[in-house]
Curated annotation (Swiss-Prot):
UniProt entry tagged with the keyword Nucleotide-binding: yes
Record's compositionally biased regions (Polar residues): 12-29
Lineage: Eukaryota, Viridiplantae, Streptophyta, Embryophyta, Tracheophyta
Known role: Involved in pre-mRNA splicing. Plays a role during development in processes such as meristem maintenance, leaf morphogenesis and root morphogenesis.
Protein name: Pre-mRNA-splicing factor ATP-dependent RNA helicase DEAH10
Species name: Arabidopsis thaliana (Mouse-ear cress)
Amino acid sequence: MPSMAQGELKSFVQNSRPNPKSPTVSPFSMRQKIAEHRRSLPIASVEKRLVEEVQKNDILIIVGETGSGKTTQLPQFLYNAGFCREGKMIGITQPRRIAAVTVAKRVAEECEVQLGQKVGYSIRFDDTTSGSTRLKYMTDGLLLREALLDPHLSRYSVIIVDEAHDRSVHTDVLLALLKKIQRTRSQPVSEKTEFGNVASQVQTTTRDANGPQQNGVLKGYQGRKLSPLKLIIMSASLDARVFSEYFGGAKAVHVQGRQFPVDILYTVHPESDYVDATLVTIFQIHFEEKPGDILVFLTGQDEIESVERLVQERLQNIPEDKRKLLPLAIFSALPSEQQMKVFAPAPTGFRKVILATNIAETSITIPGIRYVIDPGFVKARSYDPSKGMESLDVVPASKAQTLQRSGRAGREGPGKSFRLYPEREFEKLEDSTKPEIKRCNLSNIILQLKALGIDDIVGFDFIDKPSRGAIIKALAELHSLGALADDGKLENPVGYQMSRLPLEPVYSKALILANQFNCLEEMLITVAVLSVESIFYDPREKREEARTSKNHFASVEGDHLTYLSVYRESDEFLEKRKAAGSGNNIDKIMKKWCKENYVNSRSLKHARDIYRQIREHVEQIGFNVSSCGNDMLAFRRCLAASFFLKAAQRQLDGTYRALESGEVVHIHPTSVLFRAKPECVIFNELMQTSKKYIKNLTIIDSLWLSELAPHHFQTAE
């Protein structure tokens, strides 16, 4: 077992009693329990003061520790205070989809309403709101897209930007946009807004996509003043200065959280394998510590599933009376019904061990946690604009993140945090996480700003300005894709069409081109599959069987055509079963088919949902969904025309050179083309591990590049 040494004791004052777990109770008792829980939250004692502060201040910053109740209770306080009169809504944004969904479900339960009525959520490819929704939880990116259709966000009286400390790229841009919207909401509405000629630029639900249309949302407000917009910024970080300064000295109020003392323990020496050290520490706690659930922070789905499997295996090798340990996972790609399991009490006598990504730092509160295991790492996005290379890397967490993690052990009673690194390593960590806007590809966000009529991107009022190089690279990429004209404004109609689709710009352009190549059906399927976790299931204990099954679907021409084969074959299977009268058990039958074919049923189901949603979007634009049937040459040419910025050519030594960046890259072992070594390919993902790998490949003819993207390639002499 890792050797643990007692480090500095971090003590926090707690002013509320913990909430004990309860067995299953009657509906009346459940309502009573919920009411008692709400009254016990730290924020309940300051309800009146908070409502008064919102009434007095158009901008308010609320700093409250995770578990204080700010996310679930403040919107209800404001609703009860009359902020939703005349049909207005309170919008609450989250940087993560899972938080928007779980919190909305909890608030609907507290309000005793069906989800989608008074309380609803809206995330990409999933909307439960209705005309009666007044408390709307959503991702920050979703609200940004909503601003394209309603530049004044006229339906909202209050916008609450939650988890602002997360500093996601969408949160940062949204705050800048809301700063402008607040000013324009105090002026009479006209077609000319501070964002430019937005009302006439953005198309609404018309099927005529050949030019900009008048925005119908604002027609009823022409020449009138809208009511002021209240903006509340909520953060779990005690340092709110960056937000206060950005909003001209906005007032900040603090809500005390529930916090018991947490003992911080460090390893004596660095751990060479933190996954193994995590596993050992889980069982050390289980055998030696008092009752209480364990929360483990891991970097992603692969690590979580690996540790979950290893815990299950080791449980089989210990005495039966010691096996009462229940491993549960929570990460964004997990279906919501499985995510909900972490919030339920463990069976009597069992200890839960929750395996989570950094979503559990602040976005959600899991009851029952007394022990935290923190290996000290997080998966973070990075971007090199000079090479156009974006990667997801495992990096050390920041001090702010590790403090948030430790705090999770002290919500309901004294706890312990096991940091799997020496104390001296903690002192070397960065104070806070670098804002995402400084380490990501900006093409998608710039496309949305352009659609809002904001053309001066360099001069835009970002909280933290991205590098000039990153902005220039994104503008060049959008110009190459045909989204921007030579003057830097949105190209008509392509730029407007691309901004309407809730996808990365390169995927939006792929769908537009597929309409011209008469293979829109095939591209819709491909984009849907590329938008989910791996569609293939590859269990370690049955790797050979999984490989054989994958070969059944594999196309010699590449991964995209292989994905198409899986999707089509599953479609054919479904149609046959429906024709045979098996419609009632279709989900169960589909899961069985997926298991037999080593296909990830969750990913396939998600891809189907995304396909349906994107299809609706392209039909609204005015496209007819045509199919090229078995003409894969047309489809591959469309792939080349769409993804020409990610083309790679084989070199004499067998490696590949990415044509756009000049980087030496290798075909990833999971590709069906791994051993084929084709001359030229397009790819969708470049990732850095031990080597620079390209994933999701299809073979193309190199001559197609200069033919289909002549503005970007010149034929070699």
